[in-house]
Amino acid sequence: MPFGQNVQRLRRAAGLSQEELAERLGVTRQAVSKWERDSAYPEMEKLARMSQLFGVTVEALLNGDPAP
């Protein structure tokens, strides 16, 4: 599963909007939108924070492992 699709799936499973995820990560909603479209990628710090927020490893976040 592509990275962006995985981020979107995990975000929705967590019940978060793009805006809410952006606020928790300290980025703009546009940044989250770009990540989900695979037109940009987050910094390692943001990947680590997302993995904590979603309860998955960074590897699972990057590789699109199906189980959160």
For the regions a protein language model found, what residue spans apply to each?
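DNA major-groove recognition helix of helix-turn-helix/homeodomain DNA-binding modules
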Residues: E45-A60
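Key DNA-contact positions within bacterial/archaeal DNA-binding proteins
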Residues: E19, Q30, A40, E59
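Short basic helix-loop element that most often maps to the first helix and adjoining turn
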Residues: Q5-R24
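Conserved hydrophobic/aromatic packing and binding residues within compact polymer-binding modules
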Residues: V7, L21-A22, V32-W35, L61
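A detector for short, charged/polar N-terminal pre-domain segments
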Residues: M1-P2
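Short, charged recognition helix plus adjacent turn
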Residues: G64-P68
